Design a protein with these regions (language model features):
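Conserved donor-binding/catalytic core segment of Leloir-type glycosyltransferases
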Residues: 70-89, 95-98, 102, 111
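A charged, aromatic-enriched C-terminal amphipathic alpha-helix characteristic of glycosyltransferases
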Residues: 219-266
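Glycosyltransferase donor-sugar binding loop
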Residues: 109-126, 140-142
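Membrane-proximal helix-turn-helix segments that form the acceptor-binding/catalytic region
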Residues: 9-30
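Short hydrophobic beta-strand element within catalytic cores of glycosyltransferases
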Residues: 181-184
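Aromatic "clamp/platform" in nucleotide-sugar-dependent glycosyltransferases that forms part
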Residues: 163-165
Length: 266
């Protein structure tokens, strides 16, 4: 993965040795979180059987029990960025879009939500974000506890993602479970996560397409809202099925292991 922090920041040598060690352990079964991860592991010549569980472990009911949700049309006209502010998450794309979108829709609020202080592996992005905040274009929420973040999501309309380095994300399940629209690039595993829903996936890296879809998703809830979190809510069940020999449909062996890539999972 050319954009993964393990590769970019010089950790690939020791990580590759660790993976080689795991690859030699007998009776290991690999549970990958998506079809693209399966492909990377197959290319790396993993010997163990590989299964695609198609999602991260997620408890929808537990997340929803933490906060009170507002009806969509009573929520703030707010777009949330919930990923790290590191360069592989493409914060510049988000900030450029904010500047352009606000010219036409000055009433829209854009927010960065972070569990600690706003930081990045490139300080320029932190300085630029703080500059936009001073200009009144962006709000930075720092040092959030999980429930604080959930309360913001439950009063927002769109969670936006523009990451180069992302495979599947708990942030999308959280936002979807809390009644927030989600808008992600049609990149890597996200077509699988979104079951190829073109209304919530934009052309990477087209600001025009992202903004056109953002306008629509700010105006009304997606008819598919809740389906992503329903699907990831079953990830643990899929894992248990595989471990007990009942999940062979998720095994990715042989020359046709890429066939299911285009098939919607739900």
């Amino acid at each position: 993965d050319p954009d993964d922090f393990v590769h970019v920041w010089g950790m690939s040598k020791w990580m590759s040795l660790y993976e080689q060690m795991c690859n030699e352990i007998p009776n290991v079964v690999i549970l990958a979180s998506n079809e693209e991860m399966v492909a990377h592991m197959r290319i790396a010549n993993w010997k163990a059987p590989i299964y695609n569980i198609s999602g991260l472990s997620f408890g929808k009911e537990e997340v929803q029990s933490r906060v009170e949700q507002k009806p969509f049309m009573e929520r703030k006209n707010r777009v949330v960025f919930g990923a790290r502010w590191d360069q592989e998450k493409q914060p510049q794309f988000f900030m450029d879009m904010i500047t352009k979108f606000k010219e036409k829709h000055p009433e829209t609020e854009f927010a960065i939500c972070q569990g600690g202080p706003l930081r990045s592996n490139n300080d320029y992005y932190v300085k630029e974000a703080k500059y936009l905040e001073k200009q009144g274009l962006l709000t930075i929420h720092e040092n959030l506890k999980k429930n604080d973040y959930y309360n913001i999501l439950a009063d927002s309309r769109v969670l936006f993602n523009c990451a180069l380095q992302d495979w599947t994300s708990n942030t999308v399940s959280e936002a979807d479970a809390l009644g927030c629209n989600v808008l992600f690039p049609a990149y890597r595993s996200f077509p699988e996560v979104f079951a190829n829903d073109h209304t919530r996936l934009y052309v990477p890296w087209s600001q025009d397409d992202a903004m056109a879809k953002l306008e629509l998703l700010l105006s009304k809830p997606s008819p598919s809202m809740g389906q992503i979190s329903d699907w990831t809510n079953g990830t643990i069940d899929r894992m248990l099925d595989i471990m007990t020999g009942k999940g062979e449909q998720w095994r990715r062996d042989g020359s046709h292991y890429r066939t299911p890539v285009s098939e919607p999972k739900y």
